[in-house]
From Swiss-Prot:
Residues 68-93 are annotated as: Interaction with p75NTR/NGFR. GO terms for biological process: extrinsic apoptotic signaling pathway via death domain receptors; negative regulation of protein ubiquitination; signal transduction. Belongs to the BEX family. One of its GO terms (molecular function) is metal ion binding. This is Protein BEX3.
């Protein structure tokens, strides 16, 4: 346990004598790939291309139009779902299914 604590302290020490941190797993015959952290720092400011516009606008204090559109889409989906459930229930209740069909596997969700 003491060895693990000592190793953790060694890993947390800042860079000394201008040495770069090397990735773990490097052994004999392994050539370091260079400073990859510098490359990551260059790419970090360009992250916004991966985020949908709706999230960027909301994060920047958007005017709420996107939320209104989203809520309208959700209402439309709920309306269509209710319509499909009701249609299925009416079909079962009206007896449009053939008489030899087993009704035990049918179900009806009433809104």
């Amino acid at each position: 346990m003491a060895n693990i604590h000592q190793e953790n302290e060694e890993m947390e020490q800042p860079m000394q004598n201008g040495e770069e941190d090397r990735p773990l797993g490097g052994g004999e015959g392994h050539q370091p790939a260079g400073n990859r952290r510098g490359q990551a720092r260059r790419l970090a400011p360009n992250f916004r291309w991966a985020i949908p516009n709706r999230q960027i606008n909301d994060g920047m204090g958007g005017d709420g139009d996107d939320m209104e559109i989203f809520m309208e889409e959700m209402r439309e989906i709920r309306r269509k779902l209710r319509e499909l459930q009701l249609r299925n229930c009416l079909r079962i209740l009206m007896g449009e299914l053939s008489n030899h069909h087993d009704h035990h596997d049918e179900f009806c969700l009433m809104p």
